[in-house]
Amino acid sequence: MIDSSKKQPQGFPEILTAEDFEPFKEKECLEGSNQKSLKEVLQLRLQQRRTREQLVDQGIMPPLKSPAAFHEQIKSLERARTENFLKHKIRSRPDRSELVRMHILEETFAEPSLQATQMKLKRARLADDLNEKIAQRPGPMELVEKNILPVDSSVKEAIIGVVKEDYPHTHGEFSFDEDSSDALSPDQPASQESQGSAASPSEPKVSASPPPVTASTPAQFTSVSPAVPEFLKTPLTADQPPTRSTAPVLPTNTVSSAKSGPMLVKQSHPKNPNDKHRSKKCKDPKPRVKKLKYHQYIPPNQKGEKSEPQMDSNYARLLQQQQLFLQLQILSQQQQQQQQQHYNYQTILPAPIKTDKNSSSGSNSGSSSSMPARRPGPLPSSLDDLKVSELKTELKLRGLPVSGTKPDLIERLKPYQEVTSSNLATGSIVAVSSATIVTSNPEVTVALPVTTLHNAVTSSVSTFKADLALPATSSVPHVENAHSPLPISPSPSEQSSLSTDDTNMTDTFTEIMTMMSPSQLLCSSPLRVVSHDDSLSPSSSTLSTLELDAAEKDRKLQEKEKQIEELKRKLEQEQKLVEVLKMQLEVEKRGQQRPPDPQPSDPPHPFNTSDPKHGSVGSSIKDEASLPDCSSPQQPITVPGHSVGQPISTGSQTLVAKKTVVVKQEVPMAQAEQQNVVSQFYLSSQGQPPALVAQPQALLTTQTTQLLLPVSIQGSNVTSVQLPVGSLQLQTPAQGRVQAQPHVAAATQVPAAALPSALTSALPQKQEAFPQHVLGQPQPVRKVFTNSAPNTVLQYQRQPGPTNQQPFVSKTSNPALQSRTAPLAPLQNGPSLASKPSSPPPPQQFVVQHSLFATPITKTKDPPRYEEAIKQTRSTQPALPEVSSVHSQQMDDLFDILIKSGEISFPIKEEPSPISKMKPVTASITTMPVNTVVSRPPPQVQIAPPVSLEPVNSLSASLENQLEAFLDGTLPSATDTGPLQNSSEDRESFSLIEDLQNDLLSHSSMLYQSHSPMETSEAQLVSGTPCLSLDLSDSNLDNMEWLDITMPTTSSGLTPLSTTAPSMFSADFLDPQDLPLPWD
């Protein structure tokens, strides 16, 4: 074996080549090195092992002198002792709750949210500690100076030399922070000068980011306005020589810094990491600030460069932040008080310009440290009459040096005197009562609540841009359109829906004040006043740029906090409103009619406190109807019964993003004719006093709530119905903007018995309007079905009139006018009109809920409950089948008369069966959440006139008279769109007469019920016989309220329906199973 192993290496060269042999060599080398390292480790271990004596001392080995058993005993004793010690420790350890309280253990049983907040607090505390340590760590210059950082000696000398050169400038930067620490009270004089250092171009470090120079609008307001903020003071430019000219010229360096990027005011001096002054003085609890009295004043040219102790930049920044925050707080408080006391702005004259002459980098600290807390008043005309002491006090108030002879003092005060007189001469009205006049570069942001001067009401805040005119004498911007009585219409991208009606503003305001907290009446979105740098004349140098980067940040933080608070407040208000509306629903269900509200004719007065750019939720509270969003910013909205078409500046795409909460106030029928924006719709029956018109309890559209239009109807025959639903902000899916619904300007109701002349309804009011305007716009089919006594079925069809003579119901070649032959599927929260192949998406139908009280009662009595109503409905059924014989003959007579008199052209249509003629048209109006409001088509109203028993001659005569009266009363004197829209609805309202024979539906498939959980009740419209369906909706015609029928008096509704006249309902229509009443 050994021989063979010896021989084997000799055969290797034959088998393996040299390359194959290399790995083996490497392996051997590795093994050898490993053994070497192991040897070394072993050697080290042996060297470091403890001696026998040490092991004995530690009780590991028994001592040589004593026996081993004794050693074992000692060991067991020691073990027992440590065991006892541990047991004692375990017994005496604190309770778990104590450990949790000391934050050693985490609470496991506590709520997760509580734990999360605790963890956040803990992290915040740690972060604060870290930030403090980081803020107080020495800067690199300090480390170099104290030889902590190893730097070459030549570099170190050069750095120290540069720091010494920079020292006067950095010192000047801090004099502002030292002095401004006094100016915390609102009564502090406005003349306290803030100073920014304008770095000279010779300093490469500083000029890389030139510090901003404070520019001011030295606005000393009247007693109404708050004290001028600390940051609105005249600049002390560091390089400016002491002169006595009235308009100090900014050095070129200052102008360049005015155009540079926005700087922080908290760091009014850019934080230079290479500055020497980053010391740890901040750790001292009370940094020493040297205060000079006035008699110790030294002119700046004689003052030693390093005469005052410098402040640490961290502390200076902290002081400045605190001051700015306090000033903003004080200003906002004063603004709140001011706006609560005086709702309209008083004339505010700009204050005198405070020019600084003898100012250099360090002069300010001595002059302004102990200023009296009194505002500088206007100077008298002749300064020579003043005593020297008075002149000195005036100088002190303006922060000027008081040393020198009387002529010197007068000379110093003269510029202020001239400026005051010139400003008084201009007498400009400046509505700058805002807390933040802040410039970020060329843009001055001024928060100005837009008010109407007559009404003392803060209507809203519109965001717009106005050029800032800078007069040569005063540097306060004259914002001239801040006082326009109508709201300023913003650019389309920045919208806010404003509507101001001067007559009713104060009433609306008092009501809104009850709903909204006063802080929401303050300005929440700032006006942006853009100042152009070209307009900076030498005298208006005080507006170059404010040293306000920190103020910007503070302001942004505060704005965010305010927004959060406002959103919280709005949430609470919405919850309160929901509660109120629930209460009102309860009250309405019990039939307790309320006394008339004190503001019957309030216009919609939306409060849109949110900045449209942020897209935050604006809650708009409106009386009677929400303001419809026009499709163009200046488009007038036709308000029925109110002949002023007021331009309402509303938006297009931007407002779609807002969820507006529309709250309708309840106003009883006694004042129904006075309401401006309510769409009223009466059906009063003959021989009985009209019942109280039911008011919509709520139209609250939030993201999840559904439209609810409860209408309670009293009396079996008394059918006065008012549906102010013009405020539904709906829209056909084809259009991309929110549109207001067109209002139906009058209902056409054929008298059911011999009519008293006072009660003849506005049936032909539409007839004269047909040829007047070419209505090329197709109008949406509208159906409203009031679920009440037998006489109240109305059918109303809006049709496009392509030409003057075109009948409303005619078979045109328009493919969209398809006859509705197929029955409609029940609508489940969405538009689904069946069998209209070529029409655009059909208009959405909405559920209008009515609670049916079917007993004739007077206004004061409660309506019957639900069960009684059902019984009474059943009791009315036997009278129903008398309908069929009368109906078609009466309608044919009516149509003949109308066609002969030329009011309508003869329609080409099929004669439907008499069974279909007697069928009423019902409306199913399904509810949808608000997020679909933008794409929602307009509601459909179809009103079917009942039978007429009156001779048609007197009817047509009364119709023409009524038309003139109606047109006089209702057509608003707005711009061109107003009459066009009204005439369109005129024609549309009359279309029901022609539509009647086509649109009355087949007997069998008349009613579908949609039983989705929110849509409780109305019967579904189904079409059996051929009839024309107009599903086209138009944007121009959608700018009017729908169902907008304003009557001359409360007693004259639409045509009274006699109680004895046969009804149009078929018997199975009023079957309680077909007509669910879900109002529980």
Curated annotation (Swiss-Prot):
This is Myocardin-related transcription factor B. Residues 557-585 are annotated as: Required for interaction with itself and with MRTFA. Residues 358-370 have a biased composition (Low complexity). Keywords: Activator, Coiled coil, Developmental protein, Differentiation, Glycoprotein, Isopeptide bond, Myogenesis, Nucleus, Phosphoprotein, Repeat, Transcription, Transcription regulation, Ubl conjugation. Its main location: nucleus. There is a cross-link at residue 622 (Glycyl lysine isopeptide (Lys-Gly) (interchain with G-Cter in SUMO1)). Residues 272-287 have a biased composition (Basic and acidic residues). One of its GO terms (molecular function) is DNA-binding transcription factor activity. Residues 170-222, 234-311, 352-384, 477-501, 588-646, 794-846, 969-988 are annotated as: Disordered. Interacts with MRTFA and SRF. The modification Phosphoserine is found at residues 66, 531, 535, 537, 913.
